[in-house]
Amino acid sequence: MSLSIDVTSLPSISSSIYKNESSSTTSTLSGKSIGRSEQYISPDAEAFNKYMLSKSPEDIGPSDSASNDPLTSFSIRSNAVKTNADAGVSMDSSTQSRPSSNVGCDQVDFSFNKGIKMNANLDSSISISTNSKKEKSKNEHKSRKHYPKIEAESDSDDYVLDDSDSDDGKCKNCKYKRKYFALRMRMKQVAMQLIEDL
């Protein structure tokens, strides 16, 4: 039995994240979203990452976001996402710019300036071949020894039928006494033949 696995090339996953500043894709959806407080999320992820990495982990709290931390000056752009806890978020698109004040607005549009392109290729080959060869030995065709058959009916009168051979009198006056002794003698012969063969 042989097992061979041939992997011509391992799974190669190549991902490229790129920024496209010139064109922006606007997708519109309709639905509701629940927020706890009114907040704005800025799409400028690089500046937000720099800010979050500059703080110690103990100082980061729920108030650290792009809009409600006074130490950072993130401009709320026209394509920022606004959530309102009271009214929810309606995902209807709007091409107008967002108001910068705290006026309730339940319209959201998404503008994606980043694109993710992923490519995964899997080229592999698995071959399984099972070959079992039976080696025939010379002794396989050799005839087996045939031991003498034990016949249940034996009419030979060669056996002694006295009480000394009857296993302490357990088989006295039994109608199968002759067959019992014949069987016992045959078993002794078979046992002796087995011992000689070994």
Swiss-Prot record:
Compositionally biased region (Acidic residues): 153-166
Principal location: host cell
Localization per record: Host cytoplasm
Keyword Kinase: no
Gene Ontology biological-process entries: viral genome replication
Modification Phosphoserine, positions: S67, S154, S156, S164, S166
GO CC terms of this entry: host cell cytoplasm
Residues binding Mg(2+), per UniProt: D92
UniProt feature, compositional bias: Low complexity: 16-30
Modification after translation, per record: O-glycosylated. Hyperphosphorylated on serine residues, when in dimeric form. Phosphorylation by host CK1 is required for the hyperphosphorylation of NSP5 dimer.
Cofactor: Mg(2+)
UniProtKB keywords: Glycoprotein, Host cytoplasm, Magnesium, Metal-binding, Nucleotide-binding, Phosphoprotein, RNA-binding
Biased composition range(s): Polar residues: 91-104
Region (Disordered): 16-37, 53-72, 85-104, 126-167
GO MF terms held by the record: ATP hydrolysis activity; magnesium ion binding; nucleotide binding; RNA binding
General function of this protein: Plays an essential role in the viral genome replication. Participates, together with NSP2, in the formation of viral factories (viroplasms), which are large inclusions in the host cytoplasm where replication intermediates are assembled and viral RNA replication takes place. Orchestrates the recruitment of viroplasmic proteins such as capsid proteins to these factories. Participates in the selective exclusion of host proteins from stress granules (SG) and P bodies (PB). Also participates in the sequestration of these remodeled organelles in viral factories.
Subunit structure of this chain's protein: Homodimer. Interacts with VP1. Interacts with VP2. Interacts with NSP2; this interaction leads to up-regulation of NSP5 hyperphosphorylation and formation of virus factories. Interacts with NSP6. Participates in the selective exclusion of host proteins from stress granules (SG) and P bodies (PB). Also participates in the sequestration of these remodeled organelles in viral factories.
Stated family: Belongs to the rotavirus NSP5 family.
Protein name: Non-structural protein 5
Organism placement in taxonomy: Viruses, Riboviria, Orthornavirae, Duplornaviricota, Resentoviricetes
